[in-house]
Amino acid sequence: MNTRFLLLLCCLSFTTFSQPFDAIKQPNRSEEEVTQLAEDFKDWSKASNGWRYSFITANEKEAVEDFSISGYQTANDYLRATDTSTWGVAGADARQYIRTVKSALNKLPKYKGTAYRGTWVKLSLLNKLEEGDVLVEPAFTSTSTLPEVAKRFSVVHPNSPQRLKRVLFEVKINQGGHTIAGLSEYSKEAEVLFAPNAHFRITQIERTSNHTYIGVETVKASAVKNTQKYNLYSGEEVEASFWHSLVCT
């Protein structure tokens, strides 16, 4: 079997037989190994393009490429905004861009397996989270199949007046994840992207003084009933009427 393919299998099944959070707690592998694994994931992504990919447009490809560079900032700012009425023309442009990226995702390979995300979360939200709660991200959610990449995104504390804490997510992806590694300008990130409004059910939480480790699994919105649900960005409890107002149309 090809050595590079073996490395890719190792990457994709890093935590198959390990305890929760083992992979993300391990010392980082060498930069050379991480780069090679990312390259292998990029190759796998390209090889996994199905019939839907034949319908992807040049505009959609460009939108995904731009998303990984800077487009994510405008798109996610708009999706997370509580009031978009002041955006004017920029709001219309943002909505069109979001629709284009979402359309592209539906034509890119699906990924099922484990991925990771490093970020900062409001301490007020973390303090009330319990196993079984559902986190809803109104914006696009970026993850990586490489824990080393995920950890890089939680190194620098954001400039925010809110009290934040570093969080490392281990994500069991059952549905909703699409690899953009074959198109992304930052293909070394082995990125798996979720469209807005992704739902993640908490399966495990481990709190330490420096980090909070959270294990989640993807769930369909329709499957979430009688469960505490929080907006991952704002920390607010999500009500049904409020949630529908977040959907980008």
From Swiss-Prot:
It is an enzyme of class 2 (transferase). One of its GO terms (molecular function) is nucleotide binding. Its EC number is 2.4.2.31. InterPro entries: ADP-ribosyltransferase. The keyword Membrane does not apply. GO terms for cellular component: extracellular region. Changing E191A: Restores 40% growth in yeast. Residues 1-18 form the signal peptide. SUPFAM superfamilies: ADP-ribosylation. NAD(+) binds at residues 68-80, 117-120, 137, 191. Residues 31-223 form the TR mART core domain. It catalyses: L-arginyl-[protein] + NAD(+) = N(omega)-(ADP-D-ribosyl)-L-arginyl-[protein] + nicotinamide + H(+). It is found in: Secreted. Pfam families: ADPrib_exo_Tox. The active site is at R117, S142, E191. Keywords: Glycosyltransferase, NAD, NADP, Nucleotide-binding, Nucleotidyltransferase, Secreted, Signal, Toxin, Transferase, Virulence. Belongs to the Arg-specific ADP-ribosyltransferase family. A probable mono(ADP-ribosyl)transferase, it may ADP-ribosylate Arg in target protein(s). Upon expression in yeast cells causes cell death. This is Putative NAD(+)--arginine ADP-ribosyltransferase Vis. It comes from Vibrio splendidus (strain 12B01).
